[in-house]
Amino acid sequence: MSKTKVGILGNGFVGEAISFAFSPVADLYVYDTDPLKSLDDLESVHNCDFVFICVPTPMFHDGSQDLSYVESTFEKATSKPVYILKSTVLPGTTEGFSEKYSNIKIIFSPEFLTERTAKLDMLTQSRIILGGELSLTEKVKTLFNQRFKIKNIIQTDSKTAELTKYMNNTFFATKVSIMNEFKMLCDKIGANWEDALRGFVSDGRIGDSHLNVPGHDGKLGYGGTCFPKDVNALLSFSKKYDIELNTIKGGWSTNLNVRVDKDWEQKEGRSVSFKKTK
């Protein structure tokens, strides 16, 4: 019996983690615009049964989202595969592409990977979220069940799945900012940070992630390719609906104050886009 053909567009840490996870059960075809990362030609990828889209969605200077990398993948898409969009996109994006490219099949499935431990995270997911038409999410559910023994597979509409991803990322980003504020206050009044932290996290409701100040990179606040762009994208998006996300906005302001190394500004094409907004 022949294996399922799985294509991957974008061979960064997300694409690599997906390739690693599905290699035992599928024939893989991987394409990246960087020739050094590309393993197969684009036509072969679009001829697969399923195609994971793992391309960047950086932010413009005003915080809004650059979807040009995602758009370019759909411009060359075919009607054969089910396209599984893993790139972080704002609510309504998958729906919009499905309407624009009505001949192709698209669902959204957010990734919850940490770049440093992406492969392990892929194998130990606490849940899989599939957003789109039920007939399509059922097919993708079957694909995931070939590889993972995860009972918590949530099937919903694409808009809900897209929002869920932003809820996660902006919550954790804001959590980092809150902890930095606590640390500043602790230092100012001469309290014992380690004791305070131990007492704080002993309440199981707090959780055990995104608590360290400085963070895992030895720096205050958060940087990298995900949190800064996702926070700004959601803030920009919410303004269109006259919703002020004041807590998230305040967290971003704190991050700008404490984070000396604004490394996301140097990650053109991943975190920031210098293209002109449309």
Give, region by region, the residue ranges found by the protein language model.
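NAD(P)+-binding Rossmann beta1-loop-alpha1 motif at the extreme N-terminus of oxidoreductases
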Residues: 1-46
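NAD(P)-dependent Rossmann-like dehydrogenase/reductase catalytic/cofactor-binding core
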Residues: 2-4, 26, 190-278
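Short, well-ordered alpha-helices that flank and scaffold nucleotide-derived cofactor binding pockets
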Residues: 20-24, 75, 99, 236
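Alpha-helix C-terminal capping/helix-to-coil transition sites in glycosyltransferase folds
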Residues: 46-47, 79, 125
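Rossmann-like NAD(P)(H) cofactor-binding subdomain of soluble oxidoreductases
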Residues: 50, 58-117
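Structural motif
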Residues: 50-54, 129
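Internal alpha-helical scaffold of NAD(P)-dependent oxidoreductase catalytic cores
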Residues: 98-107, 118-209, 237-244, 250, ...
